[in-house]
Amino acid sequence: MKKILLLLLPLLSLSCQAQEKPFDINKYKDVILNEYAYPRFAKSSDDTVLKDYALIDIDGDGKSELWVRGDESQDWQGVFSLDGDSLTLLADADVCSEIKVYKNAVGYHSYISPGQVDEAFSVLKNSCIVSSAEMSMKFDIFSDDQEVEYEGYTVNDKEVDEDTYNEFVQKLGDTIEVNPEWHPIE
C-alpha cells in the first residue's frame, strides 16, 4: 500500500499545480474600443475594428503587456498593462504615429497634423508606470522658418524645460526591435 501511495504522490502534485489560463482578448475588447480606439478615431465604435493582439513583456517582470492593433484602414494601436480585469494605457498610435519600445519602457512619436508633433513615454517596473514624460510642439507651417508657436514638456506630470525632458528621453536608450506573435481577434 505504501508503494502505491508513493507512486501516486508525484501525480497528485502535478494535478494540483495551477494551470495557466489562455488569454481572453474578448474580456477587454469593448473597453479598448469604447474608451481608447473610438475616441482616437472620432468614429463610432461600430466602425472601429480591432484586428489582432500580442502579449509582450516590456519590463522583463514575467507579466505580459497587451499590444492591440486595428485594421489597416484605421491603423490604430495601443499598448496596455494588465492588472486583473483593468487596463492602463501605456501608449497608443494611429496612422500618423508609431509605437516605440525600449528596455523597460514604451512610447509613441506622432505627427498629429501638419505643424504638430507629440511624443510620450511610460517607464515600467512590475508592469506599472513608475515614470513618464510627454512633449507637444506646434509650429507655423506657413512661416518661412516654421516658427514654433507652442512647446510643452512634462516629466512625471510636472512641467519641465527642454533639457530636463531630453535627459529623461536619453536615459531610455535605443529603441529595441520587437517581433511579437500576433493573434487574430474574432
What are the language-model segments listed below?
Residues 94-101:
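Repeated scaffold domains used in trafficking and secretory/extracellular systems
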Residues 63, 73-77, 92-93, 109-120:
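Short, surface-exposed coil-to-beta transition loops
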Residues 75-77, 87, 104-107, 117, ...:
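Hydrophobic residues embedded in beta-strands of well-ordered beta-sheets
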Residues 20-27, 109-186:
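Acidic, small-residue rich beta-repeat scaffolds with periodic aromatic anchors
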Residues 76-91, 122-125:
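Beta-propeller blade repeat segments, especially FG-GAP/WD-type strand-to-loop junctions
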Residues 60-69, 104-110:
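Acidic/hydrophobic-patterned starts of short beta strands in beta-sheet-rich repeat architectures
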Residues 4-14:
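Sec-dependent N-terminal signal peptides
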Residues 19-60, 69-71, 164-186:
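Terminal domain-start segments
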